[in-house]
Amino acid sequence: MTVATYHHGNLANAVVEAGLRRVRQRGLDAISGRELAGSVGVTPAAIYRHFADKASLRAAISQAAREQLARAISLPRPRATNKQGAAERFRQIGLAYVEFALNEPLLYAAAFEICEPPRPDNPSAWEVLTEALDDLVRSGAMPASRRPGAEMVAWCAVHGVSNLITAPMAGVPVKQRAAVIQQVLDGVKRSLQITP
């Protein structure tokens, strides 16, 4: 039995949403155009009127996963203008990134599929991080001299610990895992000379 879950003109979005549901269950490698077509009530040929091939379909689903990551690290974290607020927002963004990886491991893995996205991410996790770093400098919580390249320092540290705790360290007790996450976040803070 198939059920149409899209409205005329919105098939591409319906397919990507169905793809995200499948990714959460089985991962990006389990994506099948035929299966997604059935889940939205169309033929496989209808899907490929919107996506050039399976690689394009996977790229769109990967991008949607990255955009979900961006939303997860954005909310509810309003931009801050004082040192303490900017530093706390930066820390919360790092924690939210790790929590996304822990809570949505297959979606997290799909987000970093090597592919050519159909358009720029919107929202973009990189832009969320960039804004947070700019706010740290504006508020005086981080020296301007530490700003160049700070995105890579922060991203690599948080992405690295996220990969470790979702794979090799998956069986580590929660308390020990939390301590490792905190050590990494503290290391980023020290490296970028963030105060307070």
Task: Write out the residue ranges for each language-model feature.
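Alpha-helical DNA-contacting segments of helix-turn-helix folds
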Residues: V23, R58-A65, A111, C115, ...
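Helix-turn-helix
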Residues: A14, A18, R22-S56, A60
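Amphipathic alpha-helical linker/stalk segments
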Residues: V3, Q63-R91, P120, T130-D134
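Hydrophobic alpha-helical connector segments
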Residues: S74-L107, P117, W126, A154
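N-terminal intrinsically disordered/low-complexity leader segments
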Residues: M1-N10, R21, A80-K83, T195-P196
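Short, structured helix-loop boundary elements
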Residues: A12, G33, A59, K83, ...
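Hydrophobic/aromatic-rich alpha-helical bundle segments in the mid-to-C-terminal region
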Residues: Y108, E113, R119-W126, V137-D186, ...
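Generic hydrophobic, amphipathic alpha-helix propensity
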Residues: L11-G19, L36, I61-L69, I73, ...
